[in-house]
Amino acid sequence: MRAILFGGGLALLVSLLGTRVAINQFTRLGYGQEIRDDGPTSHHTKRGTPTMGGVVIILATVVGYFGAKLITGDMPTASALLLLFLLVGTGLVGFVDDFIKISKQRSLGLRSKAKMIGLTVVALVFGILSLSSWLEDDRGQSPASRHISFIRDIGWITLPTVVVLLLIWLIIAATSNGVNLTDGLDGLATGASVMVFGAYMFVNIWQNNQWCGQTGLDQPNLCYEVRDPLDLAVVAAAITGACFGFLWWNASPAAIFMGDTGSLALGGALAGLAILTRTELLLIILGGLFVMETVSVMLQVATFKATKRLTGTGRRLFRIAPIHHHFEMLGWEQVTVVIRFWIITGICVAAGLGVFYAEWVAGI
């Protein structure tokens, strides 16, 4: 518990102070955000706001985690290092995307195909390592499993390695892009991430307290077959603290944006937590806001293509997608949209944690 508190607190402090430094440096270097022309006109005033603040979130998380390891004297675990690799790797893809936008002074960075290739490489490396036998512990358990998981592994569904790698890629790509789509209003994705990563911190703490590796329980419905749950909680706490510190400067009116560097990194780390904690399907509930944002874009594209094919004129389901911009176009103030979407996130997190705990209680 000391490592969790220290890691989260140190990450918060580094992020809070580091973001202020980043704002000054990025402003001096001219690392400003370019705004899409088809978005709400009110967003044009944000052009030039420093971006790539995700660099600070990533740095604060890494410092927070390893600082906690120094305090406790414990060695880093394979699961935590894999999660940090995913955070940094997906963040690097976002960094390249942001840098292209800044250097070319346009709202389009990496092309979709190039971005997906980058995410695919990171996801496959993560997947192969997390399933590899040489990272198994003395109980023969690898960081990731070959089962589909909800609250825990669904034991009767064992998948071939190729299928598992495909699912890992899908979860990482979908979650990264989901957080990326949500990051369109001041503080929206950051605040939502605080709640979801905070929820995963508590999930990991509970899994550690009921861990099959230390409780001696032989009932699979009362303990959790998860690798290194306490160390995953330290990383989740560090990310939560880093997002809290960044939110101080990212809240409306934002003094800095996280950019694709931050949104892809947070999405990748969130997917990694779901995979490593064996709660992939639970992520759909906990990260309900990110799912909603992604589905709104999918419905918008599908509706436009279908109506264009049928009538010759494409029609849109929403005024603009993702859906948070739709409500802006309806006349909602930006802060109103953000707070109400945070409320949605809070409801999703409460529902997800409730389902998680209820499943354990039902097994008693």
UniProtKB/Swiss-Prot annotation:
Its cofactor is Mg(2+). The chain crosses the membrane at residues 3-23, 51-71, 80-100, 116-136, 154-174, 185-205, 229-249, 256-276, 281-301, 341-361. This is Phospho-N-acetylmuramoyl-pentapeptide-transferase. It catalyses: UDP-N-acetyl-alpha-D-muramoyl-L-alanyl-gamma-D-glutamyl-meso-2,6-diaminopimeloyl-D-alanyl-D-alanine + di-trans,octa-cis-undecaprenyl phosphate = di-trans,octa-cis-undecaprenyl diphospho-N-acetyl-alpha-D-muramoyl-L-alanyl-D-glutamyl-meso-2,6-diaminopimeloyl-D-alanyl-D-alanine + UMP. It is a multi-pass membrane protein. Pfam families: Glycos_transf_4 (PF00953), MraY_sig1 (PF10555). GO terms for biological process: cell division; cell wall organization; peptidoglycan biosynthetic process; regulation of cell shape. Its main location: membrane.
